[in-house]
Each structure stands twice: as structure tokens, then as C-alpha cells.
Amino acid sequence: MSTLKVNAITETDGSAFPLGKVLQVVSHSKNDTSSFSISSGGTHDDTNFAASITPSSTSSKILVQIMLNHGTSSNQITGIRLMINGSCPDAAKGNSSGSRARLTAAYHAEETAGCHVVPITFLHSPNSTSQQTYNLNYRHNSGSTRTHYINRSNDDNNASGNGMGPRPMSIIILTEIAG
């Protein structure tokens, strides 16, 4: 993980740095693979793929950018929530309607040979100078226990014709923006 921190930024003439400027950037790249099982109706909070940032001001905004490569063991809908300090804020979920799950992102896996790229972008206003931790929470709509994979597919082998067992990477980038 890389972190760039500064105590103060001023213009060359000594004036205050204008709003909207980048104050610090933190990134976490995941290059290895991982897997986890989720039972029917269950969820999984993936704290191994996470990044944290400590805002320098209560007026700062945090631009959250995630590129996730995700695979599954079956044809299913996968739902993902952006977790911030252990919970998903309403602003990071779709509107409610009946008993439908409120999610940050979702996709339908129609095959298990490849990885699905899931991009997530969210502008967070923490109103705090305490550390903010970001990770993902997963669920699916299958009536059975299913295996989920990060940075690999279900068909993880060297055989031809199945994407040759793709091994992509995933990344979280947190950018503090002066507010």
C-alpha cells in the first residue's frame, strides 16, 4: 500500500491552496487470488481487500475508485456493497423497492470461465479526521452455497478454450480532495 501525506500545501505566493485539489492518495493493489463461500441468504465481508485513509480536514471528500475482478462458481446474480468503517451508507446503495437488496453494484454471471470486471466509484464525505476504511461485502441470489473468487475464475487452469485461467488484479484507490 502506498500513502502520500502532507501537513500543508500553499501556493508559491503563500496563499491558501484552493478547494478541489488532491491532498493525498492511498492505493491497495491485490495481485494474488482469494476465494470464499457464501451460503444461501448469507453475505461475506472481505476485509482482506481493503484500504484506509485518514482525512486531513473535516471538509475533505474521499474519492473512492475500485476495480474488482470477480469470478463465481455458478450462474447467479452477485451483489456488492461498498463498506465504509463496517457499514454501507445509504448514499452508496440503490433505492429501496419491496424486499429487493439495496446494493452498490450487481452483475449476472452467465458463465464461470472468466472474471467479471466490477468498477465502483463513490464520493464520500466523512466529515471527520478519523481513519476511514473501505472494503466490499458480497451476496448472491442462489439457493445454495456458492464460491466467489477474487482475481481468478472458477475454471482456474491452463486448458485452452476457457480463457486459459485468467489471473487479473484488483485495486482500490482513495483520493482525498480539499473541500
Description of each model-found segment:
Residues 1, 20-23, 59, 169:
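Sequence-level motif detector for i,i+2 pairs with an aromatic at +2
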Residues 28, 37-38, 43, 54-131, ...:
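Terminal beta-strand-rich extracellular "head" domains
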Residues 3-35:
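Glycine-rich, low-complexity segments
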Residues 49-53:
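Extended, low-complexity regulatory regions
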